[in-house]
Amino acid sequence: MPKSEIRKLLQEIKKQVDEPGNSSATEIKKMASEAGINEQTAEEIYQLLTEFYQAVEEHGGIEKYMHSNISWLKIELELLSACYQIAILEDMKVLDISEMLSLNDLRIFPKTPSQLQNTYYKLKKELIQVEDIPKYKPGRKRKTQKNTKKEKTNIFGKVVPAEFKAPTSIKEQISYDKSREKNLVDLLSGVKSNVQLLSENQGEENNVYDLLKSIYSLSSLAVQKEELDKKYQDLQTKYQELEQENSYLKQQNETMTDSFHTLVLQVADFAYASDLDQIQALPLFSQQLVVTLNQLGVFKENYKQM
């Protein structure tokens, strides 16, 4: 079956969905039979397209859906897979199928050819599941289960102990951690005893000074280490946020590049057409132009302020 027959069938299916009648299913089955396509397959695409357009209406219409936080609906992915399978079985190229299904031609999907093609390959390679896919946005952190503790590591890969929370009330000061309190008392008592022993011997003042100086130096290094560990964790968090934002901006740039390319092609096709073709194509051209401008963030309400 040639490419034109596939296109006619999909075009008829879209027409019957846009303007449903009592004989819609009959017309589709008849055309599928004449084109050599399984009638059940054609009817399945008709049902999927109907359900997809109904889902779009539930989201407030095509414009609101295109600017919603959903990138792909589950039913939309099922329809995408079915349309590609029909065309590929008849030796159509993926590039041609993407163009035919996109906003540039039959407008079955409110997507550009590259968006359709990329998503089809992701489905084929099972990189994505057939489910509602939200648009990616930066700065969002996944929710973790309650009481789940994440260990922090320093620049050497060692686990950093959790920060000690000082007691805030007298009751907490008395009973917050008896074992910790005992260890600190024993440690300080030992230091005090050693200092006293050194001080009892004449001429040992320098040793006492060196000991206290060493303790001070070690405690200072410990404080600096804690500060460095905290800064390192902060930098890691900031780096991850910047990486997410950069990925989002790249995705946005790719989308806008596709939309701009589509806009240029639409304007060029119209500008270089004959006068008669321009008059006939003006309504469709205007509609396509509005959709593409909306994808670029240009709306009727804001274009004068840009």
UniProtKB/Swiss-Prot annotation:
One of its GO terms (molecular function) is DNA binding. This is Motility gene repressor MogR. The keyword Transmembrane helix does not apply. InterPro entries: MogR_DNA-bd (IPR021009), MogR_DNA-bd_sf (IPR038245). Its main location: cytoplasm. Keywords: Cytoplasm, DNA-binding, Repressor, Transcription, Transcription regulation. One of its GO terms (cellular component) is cytoplasm. It holds the Pfam family MogR_DNAbind. Transcriptional repressor of flagellar motility genes, such as flaA, during extracellular growth at 37 degrees Celsius. Binds directly to gene promoter region and probably prevents RNA polymerase binding. At low temperatures, MogR repression activity is modulated by the DegU response regulator in an unknown mechanism. The keyword Cytoplasm applies. It is found in: Cytoplasm.
